């Protein structure tokens, strides 16, 4: 929870800086660092794909001129977002479609894969919303661009089945809350 609060404070500071201010680079670094250091992140699961195909695929949404995966720094923020949306992210059985990704899976699988695919992320919501690329997150954290895969995932990648690979990592590493 403390990391989440610190992250929100960093985003708020960043948003107050004028675009001409050189301190934005430092503020950005601290946001990326706090985000990278979260023990777990939370995603909202696409209701249609979950109910029709049993897939736990994170929501990919648009914000202003950017599109990206919606990621939350805490379960509370994810739950508040889901509750504001009515039944849009609630399964027929009443289950809120919120998934958790542990730090190791996020760092070692999701971020490098999303960076390779040139995806963005939208962190949190409302006044704490921050948008950036996974590629820049990897670069700032000086992390490896290689992602860890098991044999089944390696076979999917060798066959060129990127969608199958993505569905598999979501199935294995996203836990519904």
What is the role of each PLM region?
Residues 1-177:
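An interfacial alpha-helical scaffold signature
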């Amino acid at each position: 929870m403390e990391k989440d609060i610190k992250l929100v404070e960093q985003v708020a500071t960043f948003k107050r800086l004028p675009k001409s201010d050189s301190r934005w680079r430092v503020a950005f670094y601290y946001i990326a660092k706090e985000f990278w250091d979260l023990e777990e992140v939370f995603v909202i699961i696409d209701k249609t794909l979950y109910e029709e195909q049993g897939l736990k695929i994170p929501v990919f949404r648009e914000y202003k001129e950017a599109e990206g995966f919606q990621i939350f720094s805490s379960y509370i923020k994810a739950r508040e977002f889901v509750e504001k949306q009515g039944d849009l992210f609630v399964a027929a059985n009443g289950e809120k479609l919120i998934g958790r990704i542990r730090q190791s899976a996020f760092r070692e699988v999701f971020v490098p894969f999303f960076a390779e695919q040139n995806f963005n992320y939208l962190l949190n919501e409302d006044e704490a919303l921050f948008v950036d690329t996974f590629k820049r997150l990897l670069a700032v954290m000086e992390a490896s661009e290689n992602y860890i895969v098991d044999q089944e995932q390696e076979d999917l990648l060798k066959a060129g089945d990127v969608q199958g690979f993505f569905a598999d990592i979501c199935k294995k590493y996203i836990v519904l809350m």
